[in-house]
């Protein structure tokens, strides 16, 4: 059955095209520094926002009109698979991602839930045989059901911990079955509302035990996906333990998990943590922990996770700069963890949104590559820190000095002069590259 009859395959037509169902800047076969755009960007569709989201919010019912929503239960799950692979083919997108409950309804028992999963996974596997679209990552939803009201791996209830572990065990098996390149842990309920009734030490210790057991089981079944943690500071809990990349990295180091995990970084989560997207990417990169990206953007005037499709090309440029400096994302990719706005409720809007996001990152890729080729930012940074390449600065960096020697040096100094940071020049230069790359 076809769900998008009126829409053909999305093709690259160039910046002058007026066709809303065409890429203006994303040309998957265009070579950029020895790799195609498709290889650089590794785009993925988020199954939950694209095929299960009804666009409801706390103030109103869902508005989404989806041709597959005439079905229910397992029939709906199967219809979504059909729609998904038609969507993937028409968008020519290389990857997709899902939670367990996105693809199959939760049953009345764990056994029934697993049986539902087995049925849909078998169907997805058949579709993948004839599709170029692969599984970027999968995960399990350990946050929506009321059993997870107090957390999953960080729950105060050992039975919930066991149930969460059983779900992840099944998730790892599903990932192996479908050839997932990564496996994601997002701890939506792994945090607390108040310290007044929380044993933080026990919860953190248990969370680490959970991660170690997950990796042990992945090794047992020979599932070689990259494990990823997705930081978020809050929502739904008041304070989540994986607040941002820095706190997540400290957790991984403290529990000897830093060689097991990397980070799946979401732009909107960076905003909620009070960081720029590029800050989180940069911090992960310089610690060799940048694994994958949830490509979206938040609304700067709102304090919650709006999950908008990315359209800010200044941000996508700086993001792609960090990814290029990282020599790419390895097994990771750019998953559009984004949903159309509540007023964009037609099935056609799903295509428009993904086209906009893919074009925005294609622009970012080309501008970032030009910035790197011309060493625009590298030259700025090297010049700014040049005092550490000579004299006392070189001794500091090489560890050949101490406070005694530094005091002697300081006593010889007259007035210290500082050069201008010239931030306005740098920002204007980036604007120049943004405006001239496609001129």
UniProtKB/Swiss-Prot annotation:
Keywords: Carbohydrate metabolism, Cytoplasm, Isomerase, Magnesium, Metal-binding, Xylose metabolism. Mg(2+) 1 binds at residues 230, 266, 294, 337. Its cofactor is Mg(2+). Its EC number is 5.3.1.5. PROSITE patterns: XYLOSE_ISOMERASE. Mg(2+) 2 binds at residues 266, 269, 305, 307. Belongs to the xylose isomerase family. It is found in: Cytoplasm. It is an enzyme of class 5 (isomerase). The active site is at 99, 102. One of its GO terms (cellular component) is cytoplasm. The gene is xylA. This is Xylose isomerase. Binds 2 magnesium ions per subunit. It comes from Oceanobacillus iheyensis (strain DSM 14371 / CIP 107618 / JCM 11309 / KCTC 3954 / HTE831). It catalyses: alpha-D-xylose = alpha-D-xylulofuranose.
């Amino acid at each position: 059955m076809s769900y998008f009859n009126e829409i053909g395959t999305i093709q690259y037509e160039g910046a002058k095209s007026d066709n809303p169902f065409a890429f203006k800047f994303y040309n998957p076969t265009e070579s950029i520094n020895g790799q195609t755009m498709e290889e650089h960007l590794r785009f993925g569709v988020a199954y939950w926002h694209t095929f299960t989201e009804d666009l409801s919010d706390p103030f109103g019912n869902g508005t989404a009109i989806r041709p597959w929503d005439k079905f229910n239960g397992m029939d709906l799950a199967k219809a979504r698979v059909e729609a998904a692979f038609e969507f993937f083919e028409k968008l020519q997108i290389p990857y997709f991602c899902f939670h367990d409950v996105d693809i199959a309804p939760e049953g009345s028992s764990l056994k029934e839930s697993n049986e539902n999963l087995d049925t849909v996974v078998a169907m997805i596997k058949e579709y993948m045989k004839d599709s170029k679209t692969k599984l970027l990552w999968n995960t399990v939803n350990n946050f929506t059901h009321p059993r997870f009201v107090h957390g999953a791996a960080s729950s105060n209830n050992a039975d919930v911990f066991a149930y969460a572990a059983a779900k992840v065990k099944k998730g790892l098996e599903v990932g192996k079955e479908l050839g997932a390149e990564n496996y994601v842990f997002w701890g939506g309920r792994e945090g607390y509302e108040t310290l007044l009734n929380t044993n933080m030490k026990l919860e953190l210790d248990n969370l680490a035990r959970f991660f170690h057991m997950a990796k042990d089981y992945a090794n047992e079944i020979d599932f070689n996906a990259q494990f990823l943690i997705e930081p978020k500071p809050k929502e739904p809990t008041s304070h989540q333990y994986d607040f941002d990349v820095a706190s997540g990295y400290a957790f991984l180091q403290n529990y000897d998990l830093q060689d097991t995990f990397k980070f799946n970084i979401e732009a909107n989560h960076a905003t909620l943590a009070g960081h720029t997207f590029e800050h989180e990417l940069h911090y992960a990169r310089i610690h060799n922990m940048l694994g994958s990206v949830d490509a979206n953007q938040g609304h700067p005037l709102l304090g919650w996770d709006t999950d908008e499709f990315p359209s800010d090309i200044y941000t996508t440029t700086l993001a792609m700069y960090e990814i290029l400096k990282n020599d790419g994302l390895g097994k990771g990719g750019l998953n559009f963890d984004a949903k159309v706005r509540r007023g964009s409720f037609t099935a056609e809007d799903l295509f428009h949104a993904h086209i906009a996001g893919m074009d925005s990152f294609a622009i970012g890729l080309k501008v970032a590559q030009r910035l790197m080729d011309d060493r625009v930012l590298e030259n700025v940074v090297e010049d700014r820190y040049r005092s550490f390449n000579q004299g006392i600065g070189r001794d500091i960096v090489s560890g050949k000095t101490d406070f005694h020697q530094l005091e002697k040096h300081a006593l010889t100094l007259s007035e210290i002069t500082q050069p201008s940071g010239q931030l306005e020049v740098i920002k204007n230069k980036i604007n120049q590259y943004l405006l001239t790359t496609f001129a």
